[in-house]
Design a protein with these regions (language model features):
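PDZ-domain C-terminal substructure recognizer with occasional recognition of PDZ-binding tails
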Residues: 194, 200-201, 214-258
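Final/C-terminal transmembrane alpha-helix of multipass membrane proteins
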Residues: 40, 387-409
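Aromatic-capped interface at the extracytoplasmic side
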Residues: 46-56, 159-175, 410-413
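Internal alpha-helical transmembrane segments
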Residues: 76, 109-177, 389-393
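Hydrophobic core of alpha-helical transmembrane segments in multi-pass integral membrane proteins
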Residues: 28-45, 402
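Small-residue-rich helix-interface/hinge motifs
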Residues: 2-18, 50-127, 351-375
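Conserved PDZ fold ligand-binding element
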Residues: 179, 188-211, 280
Length: 414
């Protein structure tokens, strides 16, 4: 227990990382076996569903860029960075360059950058005090600790912009297309409407969206005669027909078609950027609600009892997200995978700013608290030891959510 406590204290409160000395042979063997297992799983995943593999690679790249954000801003602000690793657990491969040790660890569950002097618990060599995180100004601390989430937001913005300007944005096209017609005897059959026709007007009401078409029809009564204008192969036609009663709602008028008016619409680069900003901001709002939902353990408990009751509130892990990515790839292609990846980046960026350790938001909250408590040139130092019990509870909650999510993703995929 004492060993676990010390590891928690060192790696999660002080800032991650492990001793740099060479691992013993058993640890090295474990690392090699773990790495081979992970490599085998990735190869299998590539054969099983290439889109899922692409999504997983995108997630790993996102994690790498997250740490690049911390690393680059720490170096830029004069902090000392001693480690940069992809993955956790036993080391698979590492190199040293100057004061920096970098490499890959066996478990691809994230990454970390080790910055000296994250708080008063971190022992710092006397010669490194000037370069310690804790001795830098508050703006520099805040920049470094939030740079990871900032990278997620920038990546999401870039993906949204790229997809909108190349493949298009899911939006109103300005045309209402007939998707299919109903059973024989409907007004649509009397008009001769076919799949692929475009409805342009109901009476005097011009329609350019599905909602406008529904409004134009339901604002009339069954038995009303109306002129319906539609276009086929570039030729416009207008015919008169009597609206029927909706089989499910006899008081509502009924034409007898299903329609859609949305599709992927390519935008100019400038317009794409504008829409990317709007959609990123909207995703931030949705992600805040999602974080609150995800961190509520009652949602996980209810999901374990009844997985299909409310899929929107059940915990989802990388496994579930990757499954969704594979499904989107098969139905929507590359754009579907990329748009999901952008949304996930926004969520991770928001989630990581949760103001408790071990999240980056916890370090940002501590830096802000210290800044507010500092007076007359005297720097206040928060006692991070007091946060360890809270951090332990948070880690316990995260572990529960992780295992609950994994169980649901494997036994009852979305």
């Amino acid at each position: 227990v004492a060993g676990i406590y010390q590891r928690l204290r060192q790696e999660l409160i002080v800032g991650g990382g492990e001793p740099s000395e060479s691992p013993d042979p058993s640890t090295k063997s474990t690392a090699i076996v773990s790495g081979l297992v992970i490599l085998g799983l990735l190869v299998w995943l590539g054969f099983e569903n290439a889109w899922t593999l692409l999504f997983v690679v995108g997630l790993l790249l996102s994690v790498f860029l997250h740490e690049i954000g911390h690393f680059a801003t720490a170096r830029w602000t004069g902090m000392k960075v001693t480690q940069f690793y992809m993955g956790f657990g036993p080391r698979l491969w590492s190199r040293s360059r100057g004061e920096l040790e970098y490499g890959v660890r066996a478990l691809p569950l994230g990454a970390f950058v080790r910055i000296v002097g994250m708080n008063v618990l971190d022992e710092v060599e006397p010669g490194d005090e000037a370069r310690a995180y804790r001795n830098k100004s508050y703006p520099r601390q805040f920049l470094v600790i939030t740079a990871g989430s900032l990278m997620h937001f920038i990546l999401a913005l870039a993906i949204f912009t790229g997809v909108y300007s190349s493949a298009g944005r899911w939006a109103e096209t300005g045309r209402v297309e007939v998707a299919f017609t109903s059973a024989p005897g409907s007004p649509a059959e009397a008009l001769g409407l076919q799949v692929g026709d475009f409805v342009t007007a109901i009476g005097a009401d011009r329609v350019s969206s599905r909602d406008e078409l529904v409004e134009a029809i339901t604002s009339r009564a069954p038995g009303d005669r109306v002129d319906v204008s539609f276009e086929r192969d570039g030729v416009s036609t207008t015919k008169s027909v009597v609206l029927a009663a909706n089989p499910r709602e006899p008081d509502v008028a009924y034409l007898g078609i299903a329609s859609w008016s949305k599709d992927y619409v390519r935008e100019s680069p400038l317009s794409s950027l504008g829409w990317a900003v709007r959609d990123s901001v909207s995703s931030v709002g949705n992600s805040v609600k999602g974080v609150v939902t995800a961190l509520n353990p009652m949602n996980s408990i209810r999901a374990l009892q009844n997985p299909n009751e409310n899929p929107e509130t059940r915990p989802t892990t990388v496994v579930g997200a990757s499954q969704i990515g594979g499904q989107l790839g098969e139905s929507e292609g590359l754009k579907g995978v990329l748009l999901l990846l952008a949304s996930v980046n926004v969520f991770v960026g928001v989630f990581n700013l949760f103001p408790l350790l071990p999240f980056d938001g916890g370090h940002a909250a501590i830096a802000t608290y210290e800044r507010l408590r500092s007076r007359n040139g005297t720097r206040y130092r928060a006692d991070v030891n007091k946060m360890i019990p809270v951090t332990t509870v948070v880690l316990g909650l995260l572990a529960f959510l992780l295992f609950a999510g994994l169980y649901l993703d494997i036994t009852n995929p979305l």
